[in-house]
Amino acid sequence: MARSIVVLGAQWGDEGKGKIVDWLTSRAQYVVRYQGGHNAGHTIVVDQQKITLHLIPSGILHNHVTAVIANGVVLSPFSLIKEMKMLLKLGVSTCKRIFISASCPLLLPYHVAMDLARENHHISKAIGTTGCGIGPSYEDKVARRALRVSDLYNLKYFKNKLKDVVDYYNFQLVYYYKTKPINYQIVLEEVMSISDILIDMVVDVPELLDDAAKRGDSVIFEGAQGSLLDIDHGTYPYVTSSHTIAGSVSVGAGVGLNYIDYVLGIVKAYSTRVGFGPFPTELSNDTGNWLCMNGNEFGSTTGRRRRTGWFDAVSVRYSVKINSFFSCCLTKIDVLDGLKELKICIAYRKKNGKVIHNFPCSLEELENCVPIYEILPGWMISTVGITEFHQLPKESQLYVKRIEELIGVPIHIVSTGSDRSAIIILRNPFDS
C-alpha cells in the first residue's frame, strides 16, 4: 500500500493539483510543499466555497493533517502570514499545524522589485513571470547570498547580511533599471515584526518525515507549476526557476528516493499555458475562447487569461517519461461538455515535413512544429458531478481511454467538476 505519494502537474501548470491533493490528504497525516513559492495557485472548492492557496499546502483544510513547507520552497514570510490569517477567518486552525524548514530561502521585497523591473525593462524578451520574485530568490540561493529562515536566529548577522543584499539589489534597480530603490530599514522592520512567528514554526523536516515513515504515517508531496515548466526539462527559457519534476522531491524535502512509493501525474483534459513560450496546440479562435470561458481559465495568482488549446499527447507522454508516473488523474473533463468534436494531438510535423512523436528539446524546433490531430466525437450530456465511470457518456469514456492509450499510463482518477466531491476513482493510489 502506498504511503508516500507525489502529486505533480504533467503540463504547464494549472492542471487542478490542489483539488486532488485535498482529496488524497483525507487519508494522509502530512502534506509537503517542496519547490516553488507563492507563485502557485491551488484552488479547492468545498461546499461551493472557493479557497485558493499559494504557499500553504492544500491538505491544510483537513484538520488532522500537518502541513510542511520544506527547504526547496522560496518562502515569502508575508505571504505565509497573510494566508494563515485568511485560513483563520475561514475557521481553519493553523496553530501547530504548519511547519517550515530553517533552510528555506526568504523571498523579500527586493526580489519582487527585481522581478518586475526585469519584465518591464525587457518587454520584448519577457518570460511572463507572475511577478512574485521567484526567479531572483532562486538566483540568490544558487549564488549563496540568500537570507534563510535560519539566519533569523542571529539578529546581528541577519541585519548585516540584509544590508549587503539590499545594497546589491539597489545598485541594479537604480542604475540599470532606473527604478526606485528598496528601503532597507522598512524591510528589516517588517521581517522583525514576524520573525518570532517564523522561528516558532521551524522544524527539522527530514527528521519529521523520517519519523512519519517509521510510524507508518502517509505523506503527500504537493508539486507546484507543471513538468513542462521545469528549469531543466521544460521549454527553456520560458520556464519557472525551480525543478518541477518528481526527482526534485528528494532535494526539495530532504528524503531519499526510496521514500517515494507512488507518483501521480495530474493532466487537464485540454491544454493551457500562462505567459509566453511555445504552445503547439494553442487555439486562437472561438473554440479556444470557449475553453477559456467555460473552464474559467484565469490565473489564480495573477488573474491573467490563460492560453488554451487541444490536448497534447506528445508533451504529456514526455512528462510521463521524465517523472515515471504510476498513473494519471484527468481533470476538467466537464469543461468539454457541449463540444461536437474533440481533437487530440498525436504527433508533430516539423518545418521540413518530417513527422515526430517525441517532444523536441530545442525551443526553435518546438516553435516550428505543427500538431497532427486525431478527431474524436464530443458529447452533449453534462458530466458535472458524475462519480462513476460507467455513468459518463460513451464518447467521454472513449476520450479518456484514448488519452490513456496515447500517454502510456493508466488514468485512475477522473475529475468531473470543481467541487471536491466531483470525482471518479477507478483505482485509489493508496490501495496500489
Curated annotation (Swiss-Prot):
GO function terms (MF aspect): adenylosuccinate synthase activity; GTP binding; magnesium ion binding
InterPro entries linked to this entry: Adenylosuccin_syn_GTP-bd, Adenylosuccin_syn_Lys_AS, Adenylosuccinate_synth_dom1, Adenylosuccinate_synth_dom2, Adenylosuccinate_synth_dom3, Adenylosuccinate_synthetase, P-loop_NTPase
Active site feature: 14, 42
Cofactor remark: Binds 1 Mg(2+) ion per subunit.
Cofactors that this protein relies on: Mg(2+)
Cytoplasm found in the keyword field: yes
Catalytic activity: IMP + L-aspartate + GTP = N(6)-(1,2-dicarboxyethyl)-AMP + GDP + phosphate + 2 H(+)
Domain of life: Bacteria
Record: residues binding IMP: 14-17, 39-42, 130, 144, 225, 240, 304
GO cellular component, one term: cytoplasm
Annotated metabolic or biological route of this protein: Purine metabolism; AMP biosynthesis via de novo pathway; AMP from IMP: step 1/2
Subcellular location: Cytoplasm
Binding site for GTP: 13-19, 41-43, 306, 332-334, 415-417
Main location as per UniProt: cytoplasm
SUBUNIT field: Homodimer.
Family: Belongs to the adenylosuccinate synthetase family.
Name by which UniProt lists this protein: Adenylosuccinate synthetase
Organism: Blochmanniella pennsylvanica (strain BPEN)
